[in-house]
Amino acid sequence: MPIRTVMKANEAAAWAAKLAKPKVIAAFPITPSTLVPEKISEFVANGELDAEFIKVESEHSAISALVGASAAGVRTFTATASQGLALMHEVLFIAAGMRLPIVMAIGNRALSAPINIWNDWQDTISQRDTGWIQFYAENNQEALDLILLAYKVAEDERVLLPAMVGFDAFILTHTVEPVEIPDQEVVDEFLGEYEPKHAYLDPKRPITQGTLAFPAHYMEARYLVWEAMENARKVIDEAFAEFEKKFGRKYQKIEEYRTDDAEIIFVTMGSLAGTLKDWVDKKREEGYKVGAAKMTVYRPFPVEEIRELAKKTKVLAFIEKDISMGLYGAVFTDASAALINESEKPLMLDFIAGLGGRDVTFNQLDEALSIAKEALEKGKVEKPIHWIGLRKELL
């Protein structure tokens, strides 16, 4: 029987790793994700998880160790955040290029400088071009479930790419919520044994991994990573469907909320989706035709789902906890690219909010709604990007 309990998202991530039965875990502690490897080390020390736990001196070493372990043919896991993920950047490309389905939990935290240990998405968003699949959790249950789904998708032979699962620093990592821990037997049926055919070290089958590629071969190698990410679109849908059958919880790349007659739809990710849905309920009671959409999968970017969502509304607005310096928020930019060749598309707005752990309040969302309403009334967007919740007295 599944176990109903309460726990932090960090603990939920550790339980997900335990259920997935990785053989090698390598990690270096960093706020706010330290509890994940701490809990896993307890599982290993207590004999509850048969795995090698490698204590390393940096996040760069942690991901490097997992590249070697995954190339040797075993399931692997790690967790990090913020500057730790940034330190891994060099090796993230290597893991994807070598087609190693490593899974990593991320307590989404702001990047320095200034130093900040609280939540936004800049750490994972900054890794969007590395070839890693990216999932974002709204709550602690999703943190557990999406790690299991990450293994399911990453290890599929049509994909064979690493994956990361982000959940918001402190808002989720250190907050206790109800979580259902699934049966080990059901998880075993869902994931199966990891038996790689493409990459493993075997004296009877000598191969070279991570070798030099000359111009005559390099481009094809990069194409295959791109193709695998495209393949992941279908594999993710299949994994979501199978997960629902086995565990009873439904996931979608984009989950819609009260969008059927919405003139304005706000899109976001992570725990902010819960706030947004509550705010939509309040605005509906006040007579506003607004809806919400939560993006669970950011890479591969849900192009078709965004196109379908765009057909339902007159204004599509994004609330995001990241910024691509010199342009807009990354999610808005990607969505704009997805819609560029559509003959009809809604007005589009981007709202930057909640950076460095600043609360995103109903008042801030009201500010965004006011701007969206003005664009709707005028039939045009005069300024696509807006920062909401700024303390202008500090500027």
UniProtKB/Swiss-Prot annotation:
Pfam families: PFOR_II (PF17147), POR_N (PF01855). Heterotetramer of one alpha, one beta, one delta and one gamma chain. It catalyses: 2 oxidized [2Fe-2S]-[ferredoxin] + pyruvate + CoA = 2 reduced [2Fe-2S]-[ferredoxin] + acetyl-CoA + CO2 + H(+). GO terms for biological process: response to oxidative stress. Transmembrane segments: none annotated. Keywords: Oxidoreductase. This is Pyruvate synthase subunit PorA. SUPFAM superfamilies: Thiamin diphosphate-binding fold (THDP-binding), TK C-terminal domain-like. It is an enzyme of class 1 (oxidoreductase). The keyword Lyase does not apply. Its EC number is 1.2.7.1. PANTHER family: PYRUVATE-FLAVODOXIN OXIDOREDUCTASE-RELATED (PTHR32154:SF0). One of its GO terms (molecular function) is pyruvate synthase activity.
